[in-house]
């Protein structure tokens, strides 16, 4: 339970919230996610295009791949500098097997000359994971056609440290439609609830707040740094009528 780090959320309103993460639980969560979500094997190569200032950088540039015995690539720069083939040249040069990026970056690449993708051998790549914002279907379809590998959306937060919703292909081969981040990972009891009443919305296509029943699984935040009361009041008491962790994000159950 000893704190491993404090990472401030990217919210733009109010006093910044320092997410305090533990050490043991976080290590367990990352080890499990590398095996069960990413189907990672020692000796493979992981390339997350994030920055270590973000949670993806902590979890899947620094700690996760190294825990799994993988080589991890740390790259600083834009996906279009010096040219729009720079990421794919890295994939070719280092035989990247697992790649993690964001929909915005893919949308930027989509606007570039498509021939850049054909200049490099990306056959080592097993899948591309995307997170950080909603992944629209046209973008997912474009990069799927371009790379000819599974494109796997996943949803989570700075606060959770590892994916809430995704596919656990290290357990069994799963599929989902483009535009959906998949299903809840083990440990996350995800609910869609009415923002005003706290009532659970169980039908398809009903929009509500994404909540999680406690206790949260290993790897999630312990508290807000030096402000336990704010942790409870902000995250656990914002949904009326029930003690439920609020992600403050909207979600729709599609089935």
Language-model segment annotations:
Residues 35-36, 56-68, 87, 140, ...:
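Hydrophobic alpha-helical segments in the ANL/AMP-binding
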Residues 26-27, 182, 231:
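Adenylate-forming
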Residues 4, 25, 38-76:
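Conserved AMP-binding loop of ANL adenylate-forming enzymes
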Residues 9, 192-193, 252:
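Hydrophobic beta-strand positions
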Residues 21, 48-49, 74-76, 130-131, ...:
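Thr-Gly-centered strand-to-loop micro-motif
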Residues 42-43, 68, 77-206, 213-219, ...:
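Conserved adenylate-forming
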Residues 1-8, 15, 25, 30, ...:
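Conserved pre-ATP/AMP-binding loop-to-beta segment of ANL
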Residues 211-255:
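Conserved ATP-binding/catalytic segment of the ANL
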């Amino acid at each position: 339970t000893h704190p491993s780090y404090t990472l401030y959320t990217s919210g733009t309103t109010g006093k910044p919230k320092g997410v305090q993460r533990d050490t043991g639980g976080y290590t367990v969560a990352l080890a499990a996610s590398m095996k069960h979500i990413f189907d990672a094997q020692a000796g493979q190569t992981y390339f997350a295009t994030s920055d270590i200032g973000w949670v993806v950088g902590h979890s899947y540039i620094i700690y996760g791949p190294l825990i799994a015995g993988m080589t991890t690539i740390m790259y600083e720069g834009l996906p279009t500098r010096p040219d729009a083939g720079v990421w794919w040249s890295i994939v070719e040069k280092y035989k990247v097997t697992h790649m993690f990026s964001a929909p915005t970056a893919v949308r930027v690449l989509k606007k570039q000359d498509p021939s850049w993708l054909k200049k490099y051998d990306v056959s080592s790549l097993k899948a591309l994971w995307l997170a950080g914002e909603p992944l629209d279907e046209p973008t997912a379809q474009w990069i799927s056609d371009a790379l000819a590998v599974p494109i796997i959306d996943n949803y989570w937060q700075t606060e959770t440290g590892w994916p809430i919703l995704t596919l656990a292909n290290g357990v069994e081969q799963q599929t989902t439609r483009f535009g959906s981040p998949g299903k809840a990972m083990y440990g996350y009891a995800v609910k869609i609830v009415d923002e005003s009443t706290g009532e659970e919305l169980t039908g398809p296509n009903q929009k509500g707040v994404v909540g999680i029943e406690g206790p949260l699984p290993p790897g999630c935040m312990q508290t807000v740094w030096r402000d336990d009361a704010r942790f409870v009041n902000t995250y656990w008491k914002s949904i009326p009528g029930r003690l439920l962790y609020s992600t403050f994000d909207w979600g729709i159950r599609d089935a």
